[in-house]
């Protein structure tokens, strides 16, 4: 039985591109092998999704965004979800310093907020936040925080504490406290405002 299990595991591992295969892929698509190889190793069985994403969008932006994801996210992400985040997020301004670019990719372009299911919320907010309101929120993020804060809190329909998607919370106008935090950060990032949920305190923060 153990030998059979080992054979299944070995067969699976062999499906993941090795260093030589990754180098060939990078060469054929003009990609930086040194940047792609670690991502490919972490993606494991999700390597086809990774290759699809790398081929479809600008290299620097795509790799920088992929680097913000955890190893588990790289093994699980859907190309359709990443497509939403890559196409609906502007490139980091050329004048940004290296430190500013790191902050931008980590707290603006990153699809991951907390422990929620990764969902395609950027294009949703681009369509559902008016240009007038977007300009107001960019000028005064506290106004956006106040809008989210005023939403009714649901204490009845989610006893298991599942994470509601930001788009769903926005659509229905009611969510729990965690949902409010996710909603604010998603709205902020979709408007180019760096935001996060502090991992220690659980408080929402923006710059």
Question: What do these predicted ranges mean?
Answer:
Residues 163-165, 172-175:
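A generic short-segment signal for beta-strand/edge and adjacent turn/coil regions
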Residues 173-182, 187:
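A conserved hydrophobic secondary-structure block that centers on an alpha-helix together
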Residues 152-161:
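N-terminal export/assembly leaders
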Residues 174, 193, 200-203:
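An acidic- and aromatic-residue-enriched active-site/binding cleft used to recognize and process polar
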Residues 1-153, 166-169, 179, 189-190, ...:
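N-terminal accessory/pre-domain segments preceding catalytic cores
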Residues 156-157, 170-174:
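Conserved helix-adjacent loop modules within structured domains
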């Amino acid at each position: 039985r153990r030998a059979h299990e080992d054979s299944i595991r070995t067969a699976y591992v062999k499906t993941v591109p090795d260093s030589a295969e990754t180098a060939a892929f990078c060469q054929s698509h003009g990609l930086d092998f040194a940047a792609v190889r670690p991502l490919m190793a972490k993606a494991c069985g999700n390597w086809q999704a990774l290759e699809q994403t790398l081929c479809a969008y600008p290299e620097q932006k795509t790799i920088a965004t992929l680097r913000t994801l955890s190893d588990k996210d790289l093994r699980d992400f859907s190309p359709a979800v990443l497509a939403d985040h890559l196409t609906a997020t502007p490139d980091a301004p050329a004048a940004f310093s290296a430190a500013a670019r790191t902050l931008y990719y980590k707290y603006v372009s990153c699809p991951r907020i907390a422990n929620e299911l990764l969902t395609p919320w950027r294009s949703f907010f681009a369509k559902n936040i008016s240009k007038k309101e977007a300009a107001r929120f960019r000028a005064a993020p506290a106004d956006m925080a106040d809008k989210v804060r005023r939403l009714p809190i649901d204490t009845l329909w989610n006893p298991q504490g599942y994470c509601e998607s930001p788009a769903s919370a926005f659509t229905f106008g009611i969510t729990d406290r965690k949902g409010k935090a996710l909603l604010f950060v998603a709205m902020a990032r979709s408007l180019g405002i760096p935001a996060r949920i502090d991992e220690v305190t659980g408080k929402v923060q923006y710059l």
